[in-house]
Regions:
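Post-DEXD/H (motif II) to motif III coupling segment of the RecA-like Helicase ATP-binding lobe
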Residues: 1-12, 186
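Conserved catalytic network of the ASCE P-loop NTPase/AAA+ motor domain
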Residues: 5-7, 47-49, 77, 99-105, ...
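Conserved interdomain hinge at the start of the Helicase C-terminal
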Residues: 10, 20-77
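Hydrophobic/aromatic beta-strand patches that form the interior of the parallel beta-sheet core
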Residues: 12-14, 83, 129, 160, ...
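Short coil/turn segments at beta-strand junctions that form active-site/ligand-binding loops
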Residues: 52-53, 80-81, 105-107
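Long, largely alpha-helical accessory region at the distal end of helicase-like NTP-driven motors
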Residues: 53-54, 191-204
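Conserved RecA-like helicase motor-core motifs
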Residues: 55, 69, 73-96
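Conserved RecA-like P-loop NTPase helicase motor core
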Residues: 87-188
Length: 204
């Protein structure tokens, strides 16, 4: 990272601790996580509490992105702008979101990984939240690159990497293994990171 061209990046790894769960398949685990009420409320509260422009990245539009957008949008202050960007949003609208964000200093963009993993550069971005599990190293680094493009007023950016520990005594859950892979990437890239464990209650 060349000095002065890129923001300083801090990574907060937020490990949500669930009661032990056994999942037959990766898909079963994903369904459990993206429909988990407390998990989604945690992401909503984090998005609303952060200062500056915040990008919330999700994987599945209807099942997760739309749910997060609704929760955030219903609970925001009147003067705060919230955008929902996904593959179904045409390029012109995506460009409009980029322009607005570069003018704003406190907007929230709920966006699919696919839309923002490549192509859109937002200079004035302060926070990124990984709301959906993603094991793809390239995708993660592209998402991080989004934050690192330095805006004129910005010195520091923060990535909130949310992961989930549903491990049993005998087995780690799938997405926790993916998180461990991401940590390896952060070490290789020499990013600053801190791991914080947060206790979640069971599913309601």
């Amino acid at each position: 990272m060349r000095q002065g061209h890129l923001s300083q990046l801090d990574i907060q790894c937020l490990v949500l601790k669930h009661p032990p769960q056994k999942f037959e398949t990766y898909e079963d685990e994903i369904q459990y996580l993206i429909t988990h009420e407390q998990r989604n409320n945690f992401i909503k509260n984090l998005s609303l509490d952060l200062k500056g422009n915040t990008l919330v990245l999700f994987q599945r539009v209807e099942a997760h992105g739309a749910v997060l957008y609704d929760k955030i949008n219903k609970n925001k202050r009147d003067d705060r702008k919230v955008f929902f960007v996904h593959g179904g949003v045409d390029a012109e609208e995506r460009e409009q979101v980029r322009e607005i964000t570069e003018r704003e200093n406190n907007a929230i963009i709920v966006a699919s990984y696919g839309t923002f993993s490549t192509g859109i550069n937002i200079k004035n971005l302060h926070n990124v939240i990984f709301a959906s599990p993603s094991k793809s190293r390239i995708r993660n680094l592209q998402s991080i690159g989004r934050v690192l493009r330095k805006g004129k007023d910005k010195v520091k950016a923060t990535l909130y990497d949310i992961s989930d520990d549903c491990s049993t005594k005998s087995k780690r859950n799938y997405t926790l293994n993916h998180f461990i892979e991401r940590i390896k990437t952060y070490n290789e890239e020499k990013f600053n990171y801190e791991i914080i464990t947060i206790q979640l209650r069971g599913q309601l």
